[in-house]
């Protein structure tokens, strides 16, 4: 079964390593979202793949059977901020990697104006200057839920917090 301290990887690399269009698109995403490496894109793609796969499975079920599970999936994606409140499974199937990258803590910190650039946002997060509801989060890849979005700010122990108070 494997060592529980070493969990199974949650991503898979692309099937063919040298597709020019994909490489160009990945480089654009890395620059736009300040990602450290392409693995972060592949992790987002794997998460998205799982949600889309689940949506396709639900579409194959009869309507009366899938209703409960469909609501659960749509509620989960709504809470993550990926779809609107009255979304359908077609909206889940139309999600892109960009939609998921927009929900990363690093991106949300930059969009809120707490950082000067997307790279600065990554550094603030990894150095422990950003907190969600007063609790420090040091993972730039943390997917911010819809209800946590307004709770993001500087950590109370951060020098940025003291500057923001003045």
UniProtKB/Swiss-Prot annotation:
One of its GO terms (biological process) is translation. InterPro entries: Ribosomal_uS4, Ribosomal_uS4_arc, Ribosomal_uS4_CS, Ribosomal_uS4_euk/arc, Ribosomal_uS4_N, S4_RNA-bd, S4_RNA-bd_sf. GO terms for molecular function: rRNA binding; structural constituent of ribosome. It comes from Ignicoccus hospitalis (strain KIN4/I / DSM 18386 / JCM 14125). Part of the 30S ribosomal subunit. Contacts protein S5. The interaction surface between S4 and S5 is involved in control of translational fidelity. It comes from the Archaea. It holds the Pfam family Ribosomal_S4. Disulfide bonds: none annotated. Belongs to the universal ribosomal protein uS4 family. Transmembrane segments: none annotated. One of the primary rRNA binding proteins, it binds directly to 16S rRNA where it nucleates assembly of the body of the 30S subunit. CDD domains: S4 (cd00165). Keywords: Ribonucleoprotein, Ribosomal protein, RNA-binding, rRNA-binding. GO terms for cellular component: small ribosomal subunit. The gene is rps4. Residues 103-165 form the S4 RNA-binding domain. This is Small ribosomal subunit protein uS4.
């Amino acid at each position: 079964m494997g060592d529980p301290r070493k969990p199974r990887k949650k991503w898979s690399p692309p099937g063919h390593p040298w597709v020019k269009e994909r490489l160009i698109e990945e480089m654009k995403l890395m620059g736009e979202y300040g990602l450290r490496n392409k693995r972060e894109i592949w992790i987002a793609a794997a998460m998205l793949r799982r949600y889309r796969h689940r949506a396709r499975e639900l579409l194959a079920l009869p309507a009366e059977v899938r209703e409960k599970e469909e609501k659960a999936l749509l509620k989960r994606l709504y809470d993550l901020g990926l779809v609107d409140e009255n979304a359908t499974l077609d909206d889940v199937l139309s999600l892109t990697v960009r939609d998921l990258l927009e929900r990363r803590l690093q991106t949300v910190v930059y969009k809120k104006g707490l950082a000067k650039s997307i790279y600065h946002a990554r550094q603030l997060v990894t150095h422990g200057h950003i907190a969600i509801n007063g609790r420090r989060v040091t993972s730039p890849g943390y997917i911010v839920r819809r209800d946590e979005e307004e709770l993001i700010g500087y950590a109370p122990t951060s020098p940025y917090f003291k500057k923001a108070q003045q």
